[in-house]
A protein has these predicted regions:
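N-terminal, charged amphipathic alpha-helical interaction modules
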Residues: 1-75, 82
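Short, hydrophobic/π-rich interface segment
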Residues: 84-121, 125, 138
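C-terminal edge-of-domain segments
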Residues: 132-139
């Protein structure tokens, strides 16, 4: 651990004092009093014209990596409004599959995107600040 984010900036330590602290590693929300690290993350996908870094939170202390298959991440379900962005093999955004919804209502949107033969992967972001919550890939 370097104490720096993917852009070379110092990580910010934040104590959880309310909603809005989703850990990008375990995909759970931070609990009140826990310390979270905030920094920029260079998304591996999409590359090209849709590439962008994203602010993310991580627990300061070790947490288990979320690795469940066929499950929606807790930080998605708990989020009031998410943006679902589907991409093809050329890493171009499939606008017709994109949607904004409450996290608890994302299952049919994901199912539709995953069923589409053009989709290679889907990124789910917080709709307001735009932070990456998780990436979904076809197996």
């Amino acid at each position: 651990a370097t104490g720096r984010d993917d852009r070379g900036q110092a990580l910010h330590r934040r104590s959880v004092d309310g909603p809005g602290f989703p850990c990008r590693h375990c995909l759970n929300l931070g609990e009140p009093g826990e310390v979270m690290l905030l920094g920029s993350y260079d998304l591996p996908h999409p590359q090209g014209v849709y590439w962008t870094p994203s602010p993310i939170f991580l627990h300061e202390n070790d947490c288990p990596r979320f690795d469940a298959e066929d499950a929606i991440a807790p930080i998605v379900l708990a989020n009031g409004i998410v943006s679902v962005r589907s991409y093809d093999a050329a890493e171009m955004c499939l606008y017709d599959l994109g949607a904004i919804s409450e996290g608890k209502d994302v299952a049919p949107i994901l199912a539709r995107a995953l069923a589409d033969p053009r989709s290679r992967f889907i990124n789910i972001h917080t709709a307001r600040p735009g932070c990456l919550l998780t990436a979904v890939e076809k197996l």
